[in-house]
Each structure stands twice: as structure tokens, then as C-alpha cells.
Amino acid sequence: MSKWLNVGKIVNTHGVRGEVRVLSTTDFEDDRFSSGKTLYVMRPNQNERVAVTVASHRKHKNFDLLCFEGYPSINDVEAFKGGRLQVPIEDRPELGEGEFFYHEIIGCSVVTIAGEELGKVKEILSPGANDVWVVQCRRGGKDLLIPYIEQVVKQVDLEKQQITIEPMEGLLE
């Protein structure tokens, strides 16, 4: 059984010509949503994926608008509302050294170089120059915000699901 990656969520239809409004969850929109690419729609409350081929893609405000081959009207795509767009995990692109997919980082435990267990990564924010990993503290209290920079993140061990950090002054306060 194959594993799947979510690459977007269909939040609504757009117009009457079969376009769907997608909230993207991929960093590779130009590749994932290009004409001819196959995506799979996991409709709400369904256990089966529907294979669709992208006919066109364009940006509109903060959304991606997609049309699928063989779905020329709003009536054809109405059932996709609320569905997730997915691709098989084998379709993910290769990443460079020190680059990770969000799903690989979320859930990893975070420890200091001194061995103190801090918590688990629950979310990743992308505010600008670098990602920020949100760590849910083991001891309760406020979440920690860990910048993904060389000075702080010393090691990421995906096999052990563990991230080792060297906290900067004030980071753990």
C-alpha cells in the first residue's frame, strides 16, 4: 500500500467552467500543478482516490485555480469540494543536503546538546528568511520557536526521529 502526500485542499469551485480553488500545501506548485500532471482527489468521507489530470493552472489572489481534463463544468467538480489533492510519496522531488520535507520533521523530538528533552515539533512556520519549528514543550507551558539555522540546529536524525539543538541565549525562556 502506497503512502500519500497532501499537496493541496480544494476549498471551493470557481466560476462555472470546472475550475476549483485550491489552498496549496506544497512548495513545488509550478511542478505539481502543471498541465498534464496527475493528481489524486481524496473526497471528504470517501475511501477512494479519484485520479485527475491537470488541464490548466493559474494563480488568483492567495489560491491556485485548477481545471482537470474531462471535468468541464462546475457540476463535474462540485463533489471535489473539501477534498485533498494528493500524490504518491514516490513522486516527491529529491532534496539537497540539510533540506527536509515538513512531514519528516513534524513529530520529531527535540533535545539540547546537553541531552535535555524539550518536546516534539508540532508545526513549521515559514515567515521569511528561514523556517521556524514550533516545539510543543514536554513540561507544558508555551511552545518553543526554534529557528532552522546552523547556529541552533546541530543535527537532524530522521531514523531516530530526533533533532539536536544548541539553544541561543534566551531561546528557551
UniProtKB/Swiss-Prot annotation:
Which InterPro entries does the entry link to? Answer: PRC-brl_dom, PRC_barrel-like_sf, RimM, RimM_N, RimM_N_sf, Transl_B-barrel_sf
> In Gene Ontology terms, what is a biological process of this protein?
rRNA processing
Which Gene3D superfamilies does the record associate with it?
Answer: PRC-barrel domain, RimM
Which stretches make up the PRC barrel domain?
Answer: 97-171
Query: What superkingdom heads the lineage?
Result: Bacteria
A GO cellular component annotation here is: ribosome
Q: Where in the cell is it found?
A: Cytoplasm
Q: Name one GO molecular function term.
A: ribosome binding
Classify the main location.
cytoplasm
Q: What UniProt keywords are attached to this protein's entry? A: Chaperone, Cytoplasm, Ribosome biogenesis, rRNA processing
Family note: Belongs to the RimM family.
Provide the assembly information.
Binds ribosomal protein uS19.
Free-text domain note:
The PRC barrel domain binds ribosomal protein uS19.
- Name assigned to this protein: Ribosome maturation factor RimM
The record lists the organism as Halalkalibacterium halodurans (strain ATCC BAA-125 / DSM 18197 / FERM 7344 / JCM 9153 / C-125)
**Underlying gene:** rimM
